[in-house]
Regions:
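An extended, acidic
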Residues: 2-176
């Protein structure tokens, strides 16, 4: 439903021959604690860089204190498909996904663009935007990539504008 901020789908039970409405509702939570927020790091290459990046992000957001024994109650959901991650945001389970593998690999001097997301991976981003969430570049700009199968894409998705406003300036400050 373009412009309404509401997304409704149908779930079909093929065995029973019934269906029911599914409403896509991203989390309205203004905080990350006790929720899922993920920095993508699927393969061994770049995990150290991405892990350090993630720790700095939580530190600068005031949610992690270096040297503290306090456990950060924020969970990861390393869902291997970008469309699946957007579905988790739409379901209300996840609050944020950051995919900056392209920046990590470039900073490490690696040509690993084939191991990053591509435009087709993000074909579901319009659904999240219509439901009230957001998908953008790590620098807070709209995604503007050619629709092909080779262009590497970095992206960030938020469940709601409150989280986006909180993270966006910190994220920009951490990027090379």
């Amino acid at each position: 439903m373009k412009g309404t901020g509401k997304v409704v789908g149908l779930a079909h039970d093929v065995r029973a021959g019934t269906h029911m409405k599914l409403r896509a509702t991203p989390s309205p939570a203004p905080e990350f604690q006790h929720g899922f927020a993920t920095v993508d790091k699927y393969i061994p290459v770049g995990q150290a860089w991405l892990g350090a990046f993630e720790e700095k992000l939580w530190e600068r957001l005031g949610l992690l204190t270096p040297g503290s024994s306090k456990v950060l109650p924020i969970f990861e959901d390393q869902y291997i498909a970008s469309g699946g991650q957007i579905a988790e945001l739409l379901s209300g389970r996840d609050r944020m996904v950051i995919d900056v593998r392209l920046e990590a690999y470039a900073e490490m001097g690696l040509d690993s663009a084939s191991l990053c997301s591509h435009p087709y991976d993000l074909c579901t981003e319009l659904i999240l935007r219509e439901a009230g969430g957001g998908v953008e570049t790590p620098r807070g700009k709209p995604l503007r990539s050619p629709m092909d199968v080779t262009t590497p894409v970095s992206w960030v998705a938020y469940a709601n504008p409150v989280l986006a406003r909180r993270v966006r300036p910190v994220l920009r400050s951490l990027l090379p």
